[in-house]
Amino acid sequence: MLPMNRNTLGLAVTIATVFVSSTVTAEVDFHGYVRAGIGISGENGQQVRYQSNKVGRLGNEDDLYSEILLGKELYSQDGKSFYVDSMMALLSDGSNDFEGTNTSCELLKNSAGDVDDVSCDNDAEFAIRQFNVQAKGLIPSNPDAVSWAGKRYYQRHDIHISDFYYWDTSGSGAGVENLSVGTGKLSLAVLRQDSGDINVNNFDIRYAEIALWQDANLELGFNYGLINETDAQKAEVGEDPLMLTAEITMANVIGGLNKTIFQYATESYGEQMAGLGAGNSPDATSDDGIDGYRIINWGVIAPTKTWEIGHQIVYANSSFDSQDDHSIFNVVVRPMYKWDENMRTVFEGGWFTEEDNKVDSSGSKFTVAQAWSAGSSFWARPELRVYASYLKDYENDNAFGIGNDTEYNLGVQVEAWW
């Protein structure tokens, strides 16, 4: 349990009051996510993380991360409903028994052995990730449309095997989603995503479920970052960024699914293309004249009853007026062999090459894990895994400490969602 300061305690009391109100008899919805474990590396003490978005996350994570979601329908009458949703998140390095938000500090010494600085860190970070109300049935012509306001994860698109979010505009805001328009579904939202102390609002428009051919559909998206600077900030801000997204989803592809994504963006969103950003939290001071694009393909297939294979392929480029291009190409593959309903052997290999303003970098990772899960599906969780990973950096001889361009991780991890 986290030690509670006054603000944390007040928040907890508020949440509890909402969800246990005697005037509402519906059960509380309880969902969550957790990853945690223990591991060591060859040269760096505990297990290390190396470019996990580019080479894959299996056996390549060094944290304890959890999300706890509580939700409750507060009203349901005459086809109208109101639902309150909340989520708290906790992040730590998992190094101790009692990890809280109390700050721990250490004195730092210079080369002469004299104390000349202090470094302070929290054992754990606690965050409010979602707190919103979603209302359904308020639009008579669109009874399935959802009107919402508050802070929320907003229609996030990611690749699980690398934890790469390529379209994620989450934040505080408001909108209407799932409007039936033509043959598809329209969603409109505005979300606040400040850049430091500069106010930025992301206008998000999506049109989904556009039928293409059998078992295939298209989603289109437009994001516009409106920089709302003060008079004093006008000299330091750049141009408003925009991002266009097209995602084709195909079901029943060799027993699985496949997604192909095309994205084009300008200004600070353009910078995020090769930077593997998600189209949120733009840098309002970013240099003008940036264009970026990326092409992504990812999916999971089941070629036989005993094998499932996940993959991602990403190519991205960002062009600047003031410097040379930033480009990246990466591939991650995760094959899984199922021994029975609960035991599997999982492999993951990843490789990337990158050039950023004429600076080259590249690396790879290979992991083998023996795992036990609640079911045989690629997506079955909870999953307990024992893993060994080999990491290699091809450009930096000191990537893992002085004179070390390779490293290994050995560890045990659990991953669960519910």
UniProtKB/Swiss-Prot annotation:
GO terms for molecular function: maltodextrin transmembrane transporter activity; maltose transporting porin activity. The keyword Ion transport applies. It is a multi-pass membrane protein. The record marks Y165 as: Important in sugar transport. InterPro entries: G_neg_Bact_CarbUptk_Porin (IPR050286), Maltoporin (IPR023738), Porin_LamB (IPR003192), Porin_LamB_sf (IPR036998). It catalyses: beta-maltose(in) = beta-maltose(out). It comes from the Bacteria. GO terms for cellular component: cell outer membrane; pore complex. The record marks Y33, Y65, W379, W417 as: Greasy slide, important in sugar transport. GO terms for biological process: monoatomic ion transport. Residues 1-26 form the signal peptide. The keyword Iron-sulfur does not apply. It is found in: Cell outer membrane. Keywords: Cell outer membrane, Ion transport, Membrane, Porin, Signal, Sugar transport, Transmembrane, Transmembrane beta strand, Transport. Its main location: membrane. Induction: By maltose. Belongs to the porin LamB (TC 1.B.3) family. PANTHER family: CRYPTIC OUTER MEMBRANE PORIN BGLH-RELATED (PTHR38762:SF1). NCBIfam families: PRK09360.1. Homotrimer formed of three 18-stranded antiparallel beta-barrels, containing three independent channels. Involved in the transport of maltose and maltodextrins. This is Maltoporin.
